[in-house]
Regions:
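Long, K/E/R/D-enriched contiguous segments that form extended
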Residues: 189, 257-259, 270-284, 290-297, ...
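Terminal low-complexity tails and localization/encapsulation signals of metabolic enzymes
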Residues: 436-438, 444-565, 569, 578-594, ...
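ALDH superfamily catalytic-core signature
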Residues: 708-713, 735, 741, 748-808
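Positively charged, amphipathic and often flexible ligand-engagement surfaces
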Residues: 1-501
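Generic hydrophobic/aromatic pocket-lining and core-packing "Φ" positions
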Residues: 253, 366, 680-681, 730
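A structured beta-alpha segment of the ubiquitous adenosine-cofactor-binding alpha/beta core
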Residues: 372, 652-654, 720-743
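Periplasmic-binding protein-like
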Residues: 380-383, 741-745
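Conserved small-residue-rich beta-alpha loop and adjacent elements
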Residues: 641-715, 787
Length: 808
């Protein structure tokens, strides 16, 4: 229900539940915590480095890119190329002598010097001296960056093996601390990966069990990522994934219960939330886990569904008569969630756009855990925010709970909490080799080092205390609930609205979409030439057979001699007149609206006639809609007013655009709607008459698109529809000399034929705008992250069976 809920309305509902005013004693306590944190962090080189190079700057991001990628590079030459690429174009000199730390200033001097020496010096006559400096500088810089990476690894990675981690954790119990060991950084890409990770978890359970034997309480636990246990952990594969994933997780959970090692299921991306809850419910409901109480769940408060999931978990625990530990976190994938929602064209974001809204939702979830959920849900509060910590402490709950922090962060805060209140703290502890866990590390640093986060702000003495102790509700009431810098996904484009997509990874939206798509199976379609409003039918039409199931979609009446001759005669009569630009562009905008209105039918046709997957069919309709709005705006921009060009004194050069005349548009089958619409609307927007010739394999889609175009107000004199065999139509039309431009997308061979015909049969130059097939290659060196590279390569090469001009 709350997945894509209106953020303004949801946050307002939250605000209505926070009427209380904080007293002076609360502010005094939070201030004391913050001052203690600042005093401790002032001695940390890493904290000072992150303060100077915060992750809202180009330099900060560059350092993270180097940290994440340089460690993978095995050879000096590639490492040097990476350093030159990343260091030479940044403003390192602005950071020199800005920090109170000698070591941070030294690093700034080194980076500034490196950047200057590594940057190409086009004005210097002596390349030999420059080359020598580059070589010396690269060696020094490479060593310095390598040292910085090792420092970061030592700070944020708990140990390289689980055995080493257990040894490191021995000293924690007397400080009322324990660990939650995370064995991995990223997800499984192959079945071999999944098996390897399963075995790593299985082995870790044995080792942690031995370490827990000496403990009275505060048992160490293991965090498990479901994406590590199956390479296709995604909703579209749920019928295959669910039984296999449940089996693997249940095996680990049963062993964990036998060894008395608590486990926690990590939260991941929002689109995986539903399938994760199905897995969790299936495993928790198994009889072998009855009455255990150490199977934990992670809830992310930046998600709008966090509070409703807590209610669901409470009901599940009540039904099963068990307790469920809940680790409440802010969330680790915010940047990706925002980007994905924008790419998909969703109506809303699944996460809050304001950090203060996430903080407020966290407090609401914490309140539920300490009140209504207290008998079934065991709270584990993971936060580095001193305000949040003090707020939870002062709820005066009798419920026992623990705090949690990330390895390398929040140590000074929880040392104070332990000393003042004796509340235990669990350390989320990544385990693994540095080069394997650096992507995880960078994500955590970006998440917690962004200039809006408490971890960053508390380090900056320039940020006044009153900003750090302000209730998130007070901030949201006094400012904007919505983030002014993050428009809704439909509003991210400047000149026109982003096309609306569908969240097919969510079961509710998927089934709603299919309920609207499937009824079109009952329709019977017809494709036939349309010339000046007249439809040309033939005696023996061919069946339009779906490549999906072999069923007939309707009939194809291909253009034959009568239709082709009528088309030539229509062009020769030349009665078409250019319409007003504003009327044309308004009609093209209405075409976009019509595509949106009929999108479920068009999705059906793209799937059944072109053989597209559901997601690709949705993307096809969206791209067609975007083409309409884009070309409409471009026409308004270039045709509305003349452009005065630069010229010499006494001379005036004026650029005006005008229609070319009749444009023949020939579109392919692999993008039967998007490219068809794109070609036609681009030509129409410029005031031309258009002859649209679609691919034979997808004539029904094109016919339906033409009907939508006519419904939008484009005259039947301005658009002629000519489906049929390519050469039978194209050759006589070009030979007639009545075509003034050709737009073609298809094979290189066909494009060369058309080019030759234009040359042979026309006395004047006739433009050919051709986008033809190509062979594509991707270059990836050792700086690339394999976990990101491989999925993109597979999608490019095999999505749509590789039938795209951009496919690998």
């Amino acid at each position: 229900q709350y997945y894509l809920f209106d953020e303004q309305d949801y946050v307002q509902e939250l605000l209505d539940t926070f009427p209380e005013q904080l007293d002076e004693n609360f502010s005094h306590n939070v201030t004391g915590l913050i001052e203690g944190i600042r005093e401790h962090n002032s001695h940390s080189i890493l904290h000072q480095l992150l303060q100077e190079y915060d992750l809202s700057t180009d330099e900060g991001i560059t350092l993270m890119c180097l940290a994440e990628s340089l460690i993978r590079v095995p050879d000096v030459a590639t490492a040097n190329d990476l350093l030159i690429d990343k260091l030479s174009e940044r403003g390192w000199q602005h950071h020199v002598n800005k920090s109170e730390s000698f070591w941070v200033n030294a690093a700034s001097w080194g980076l500034a010097l490196s950047g200057k020496l590594l940057a190409p010096n086009k004005s210097h006559p002596s390349e030999a001296v420059s080359g020598l400096l580059n070589k010396l500088t690269l060696n020094i810089t490479r060593e310095a960056v390598g040292r910085a990476i090792r420092i970061m690894g030592e700070q944020f990675i708990y140990a390289q093996t689980i055995e080493e981690a257990i040894e490191n954790a021995k000293h924690l119990e007397h400080k009322q601390q324990c660990c939650s060991f995370d064995m991995l950084g990223e997800e499984a890409l192959t079945e071999a990966d999944a098996q390897h990770y399963f075995e790593a978890y299985d082995h870790a359970l044995d080792v942690v069990a031995q370490g827990n034997q000496r403990k009275q309480q505060l048992l160490d636990n293991i965090s498990i990522k479901l994406s590590a246990l199956h390479p296709r952990y995604e909703p579209s594969q749920q019928h295959t994934v669910l039984p296999q994933l449940v089996k693997r997780l249940l095996a680990l959970a049963m062993k964990a219960k036998q060894l008395n090692v608590p486990i926690t299921i990590d939260a991941e991306e929002q689109y995986r939330l539903d399938i994760s809850l199905q897995v969790i419910e299936s495993v928790l409901s198994h009889q072998h886990l009855a009455n255990w109480g150490h199977f934990g769940i992670v809830i992310q408060s930046y998600g709008k569904r966090a509070l409703s999931i807590l209610h669901w978990l409470h009901a599940l625990a009540d039904k099963l008569q068990i307790t469920i530990p809940v680790r409440l976190v802010k969330g680790a994938y915010w940047d990706s969630e925002i980007k994905w929602a924008q790419q998909l064209g969703l109506p809303e974001y699944p996460v809050f756009t304001q950090k203060h809204s996430t903080d407020l939702n966290y407090l609401a979830c914490a309140r539920f855990l300490l009140t209504e959920g207290q008998h079934r849900l065991i709270p584990k509060f993971a936060t580095h925010n001193a305000f949040t910590v003090q707020y939870i402490i002062e709820m005066h709950s009798t419920v026992e709970f623990e705090f949690q922090r990330l390895q390398g962060m929040g140590e000074s805060l929880y040392d104070q909490i332990n000393e003042q209140h004796g509340i235990p703290c669990r350390i989320y502890s990544p385990i693994g080799l540095h080069n394997e866990l650096l992507p995880y590390l960078v994500r955590r640093l970006i998440e917690n080092g962004a200039n809006s986060s408490f971890v960053f702000q508390v380090q900056d003495p320039q940020i006044p205390l009153h900003m750090l102790i302000e209730h998130p509700a007070d901030y949201l009431i006094s400012s904007s609930i919505l983030n002014p810098n993050i428009p809704l996904p439909c509003e991210i484009l400047v000149d026109y609205p982003n096309s609306q997509g569908i969240e097919l990874q969510h079961n509710t939206f998927y089934y709603q979409t299919m309920d609207k798509v499937l009824p079109f199976h009952e329709e019977h379609y017809r494709c036939a030439p349309i010339i000046n409003g007249q439809t040309f039918l033939i005696d023996q039409p061919s069946d339009a057979i779906s490549p999906v199931d072999g069923q007939s979609l309707g009939q194809n009446h291909w253009a034959q001699n009568r239709a082709i001759e009528h088309c030539q005669q229509t062009l020769a009569d030349d009665t078409f007149e250019f319409k007003d630009l504003e009327l044309i562009t308004q009609a093209i905008d209405r075409i976009a609206d019509g595509l949106q209105q009929h999108r479920h039918e068009l999705i059906f046709l793209c799937m059944q006639e072109a053989g597209k997957t559901l997601q690709n069919a949705v993307n096809e309709v969206r791209e067609a809609e975007d083409f309409c709005r884009y070309y409409s705006r471009q026409a308004q921009k270039h045709f509305a007013n003349a452009t005065i060009l630069d010229s010499v004194t006494g001379e005036e050069n004026i650029l005006r655009y005008r229609p070319r005349g009749t444009v023949l548009c020939i579109s392919p089958w692999n993008f039967p709607l998007a490219i068809f619409i794109g070609q036609v609307c681009a030509a129409l927007a410029c005031g031309n008459r258009v002859i649209a010739k679609p691919a034979r394999q997808t004539g029904i889609i094109a016919m339906r698109a033409v009907e939508i175009i006519f419904e939008a107000g484009i005259s039947q004199q301005q658009l002629i529809f000519m489906p049929g065999n390519g050469a039978d139509i194209t050759h006589p039309l070009i030979k007639s000399g009545l075509i003034h431009m050709v737009c073609f997308t298809g094979s290189t061979r066909a494009a060369r034929e058309i080019q030759q015909w234009l040359f042979d049969y026309n006395q004047t130059f006739i433009p050919l705008l051709a986008e033809t097939g190509g062979q594509n290659v991707m270059f990836a060196d050792s700086t690339a992250l394999i976990e990101q590279l491989v999925p993109d390569v597979i999608e490019s090469a095999f999505d749509s069976c590789g039938q795209r001009c951009s496919a690998l």
